[in-house]
């Protein structure tokens, strides 16, 4: 079986990312999940699992006093032992009245570098992890993106609030 995404065909046993933004009372929320189309193979299943685990590794670093470099380093350090890479062309971001606000939250970085996280900040952490190289191609629709080497990639995202009691995930799913 297959499904259509825009004008592109989505083939069974592949994976697809669903990135959703919702506005409520003038404020934005952003979340993404990558899911299999039908059943998936072990390699894709591992990619999905590692990407979600990398998201939570980054979220653990989202505390007052840490930096965006701490988050990015946690994400990249988590995926590298699996032979995976992270996209550098797309990053997480602050969010609020606008969907994309400062600061940018890369999925790579140096601990202690970049903007410092403060209590009350609302950010989106969104690892985009590739099984191969991080080079990408934008599809003809101008929106969809695939890896240049044709290997799978996965994307997970949560909107979180930085609090003195640790990160609070606003987009947690059941």
Task: Label the predicted regions.
Residues 1-6, 11:
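Single conserved hydrophobic/aromatic residue that forms the stacking wall/gate
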Residues 2, 69, 88, 153-154:
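Residues that recognize and position ribonucleotide moieties
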Residues 3, 62-63, 117, 154:
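Hydrophobic beta-strand core residues of beta-sandwich domains
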Residues 9, 64-80, 138-143, 170-174:
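A broadly tuned preference for mixed-charge, low-complexity surface segments
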Residues 12-39, 109-174:
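Charged, cofactor-coupling segments
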Residues 23-29, 40-116, 122-134:
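Conserved, well-structured core segments that form or line functional sites
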């Amino acid at each position: 079986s297959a499904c259509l995404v825009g004008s592109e065909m989505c083939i069974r046993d592949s994976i697809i990312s669903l990135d959703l933004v919702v506005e409520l009372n003038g404020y934005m929320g952003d979340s993404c999940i990558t899911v299999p189309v039908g059943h998936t193979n072990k390699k894709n299943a591992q990619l999905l699992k590692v990407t979600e685990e990398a998201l939570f590794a980054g979220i653990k670093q989202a505390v007052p006093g840490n930096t965006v470099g701490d988050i990015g380093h946690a994400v990249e350090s988590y995926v590298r032992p699996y032979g995976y890479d992270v996209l550098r062309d797309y990053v997480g971001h602050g969010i609020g009245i606008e969907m994309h606000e400062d600061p940018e939250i890369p999925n790579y970085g140096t601990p202690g570098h970049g903007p410092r996280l403060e209590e009350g900040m609302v950010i989106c952490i969104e690892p985009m992890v590739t099984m191969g190289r991080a080079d990408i191609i934008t599809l003809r629709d101008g929106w969809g993106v695939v890896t240049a080497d044709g290997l799978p990639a996965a994307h997970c995202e949560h909107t979180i609030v930085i609090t003195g009691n640790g990160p609070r995930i606003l987009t947690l799913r059941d």
